[in-house]
């Protein structure tokens, strides 16, 4: 009986993990393809496609945005819906339920957000690019887990759970930062209507309404309200995910709306939405004439050092201090080397950092420069993280050989 309950708890987590990690390879392919096309004779067509306006609806009941905005505001809301459902499930039934089990990844995630932001701010103090302080705070869960699964196949499950929980908390932190700091002028009427819709979602859950269509319709209305309010529309996805019925206990979880939607949307989010987002946003035009100069601008240095150095200091430093003070303890079979390797992979910002950069900078040149540095920092983190885990594998193999 206990094994069945354990399987029910872990199966969605493992399903999510498998989808996120394997989609990292597809994300990488899409990003490389976007860069190659943006720097080829097809660049004009690439730009034209994503800046073409598409109108949905009719008259006053219509929305008109570029393809890029439909991707960043529309499709990404579905990605954040999956994140919202994942957060709720982990808080209610999973790895974020117990305070003792969550203090380490939560604190590490907070440290991994604060330190990179401070490093960026130090480089950009009194500069107009200070608005990009949120860029190095983000971790790309798909790439981070993808790299871990590729280079550390024999890593203890504890470090996988740690990095996953850390990335989830990191996503939640990014959502809060976007909601509070990266918004245009607020329309209070639209925001009030959005809050009323969200309250309706909460009441629907409380009164145990089990019609999925009602939640989806209310979620779309909430998305429109937030889009019109100036609050970034992707927040609607998180709010919808957090308000979906999850079941009173683990036995009823698999019949809940949240479980069903999560299993339907997770593969679409991992293998369709995120690759499209990567392809649409990673098309950086590399100007070799000004390449070295742009690398040493305050924004570039802030992003590279924030992601590559700041994440390591923030995640590993916070974890090490908490463990030394005996406030937290190592996950099962996890060593400080594993924690350090995971903290390095935390510096893979990629899609999430690119997303925040698109909200931070209106200037196309600065935005292109920021995206390029995000790619550089993410590649550095992925490469160095691989070296760290290869070293751990070598040490373990050497130890096993001596023992045999």
Swiss-Prot record:
Stated role: Na(+)/H(+) antiporter that extrudes sodium in exchange for external protons.
Bilayer topology term: Multi-pass membrane protein
Residues annotated as transmembrane: 24-44, 67-87, 103-123, 132-152, 161-181, 184-204, 216-236, 266-286, 303-323, 339-359, 372-392
Top-level taxon of origin: Bacteria
Protein name as annotated: Na(+)/H(+) antiporter NhaA 2
GO cellular component terms listed in the entry, alphabetical order: plasma membrane
Record key words, sorted: Antiport, Cell membrane, Ion transport, Membrane, Sodium, Sodium transport, Transmembrane, Transmembrane helix, Transport
Family matches, as PANTHER family: NA(+)_H(+) ANTIPORTER NHAA, SODIUM ION/PROTON ANTIPORTER NHAA-RELATED
Classification via HAMAP family: NhaA
GO molecular function: sodium:proton antiporter activity
Similarity remark: Belongs to the NhaA Na(+)/H(+) (TC 2.A.33) antiporter family.
Location within or outside the cell: Cell membrane
Reaction it catalyzes: Na(+)(in) + 2 H(+)(out) = Na(+)(out) + 2 H(+)(in)
Protein's GO biological process: regulation of pH
Taxonomic lineage from the root: Bacteria, Bacillati, Bacillota, Clostridia, Eubacteriales
């Amino acid at each position: 009986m206990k094994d069945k309950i354990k399987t029910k708890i872990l199966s969605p987590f493992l399903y999510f993990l498998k989808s996120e990690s394997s989609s990292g390879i597809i994300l990488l392919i899409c990003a490389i393809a976007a860069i190659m096309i943006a720097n080829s004779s097809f660049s004009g067509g690439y730009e034209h496609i994503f800046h073409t306006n598409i109108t949905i609806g009719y008259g006053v009941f219509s929305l008109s945005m570029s393809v890029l905005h439909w991707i960043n505001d529309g499709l990404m809301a579905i990605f954040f819906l999956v994140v919202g459902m994942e957060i709720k499930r982990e808080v209610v039934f999973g790895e974020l339920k117990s305070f003792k089990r969550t203090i380490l990844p939560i604190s590490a995630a907070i440290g991994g957000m604060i330190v990179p932001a401070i490093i960026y701010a130090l480089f950009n103090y009194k500069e107009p690019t200070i608005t990009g302080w949120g860029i190095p705070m983000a971790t790309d869960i798909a790439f981070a887990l993808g790299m871990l699964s590729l280079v550390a196949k024999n890593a203890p499950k504890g470090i996988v759970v740690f990095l996953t929980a850390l990335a989830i908390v990191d996503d939640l932190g990014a959502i809060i930062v976007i909601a509070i700091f990266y918004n245009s002028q607020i329309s209070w009427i639209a925001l009030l209507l959005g809050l009323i819709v969200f309250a309706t979602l909460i009441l629907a859950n409380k009164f145990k309404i089990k019609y999925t269509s009602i939640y989806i319709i209310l979620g779309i209305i909430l998305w429109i309200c937030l889009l019109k309010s100036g609050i970034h529309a992707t927040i609607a996805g998180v709010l919808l995910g957090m308000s979906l019925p999850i079941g009173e206990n683990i036995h009823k979880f698999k019949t809940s709306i949240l479980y069903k939607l999560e299993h339907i949307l997770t593969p679409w989010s991992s293998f369709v939405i995120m690759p499209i987002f990567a392809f649409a946003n990673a098309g950086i035009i590399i100007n070799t004439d000004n390449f070295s100069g742009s690398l040493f601008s305050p924004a570039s240095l802030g992003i590279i050092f924030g992601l590559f150095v700041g994440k390591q200091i923030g995640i590993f430093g916070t974890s090490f201090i908490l463990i030394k003070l005996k406030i937290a303890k190592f996950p099962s079979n996890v060593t400080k080397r594993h924690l350090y390797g995971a903290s390095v992979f935390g510096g893979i910002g990629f899609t999430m950092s690119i997303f925040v950069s698109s909200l931070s900078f209106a200037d196309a040149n600065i935005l292109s420069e920021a995206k390029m540095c995000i790619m550089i920092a993410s590649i550095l983190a992925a490469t160095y993280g691989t070296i760290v885990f290869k070293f751990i594998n070598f040490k373990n193999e050497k130890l096993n050989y001596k023992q045999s």
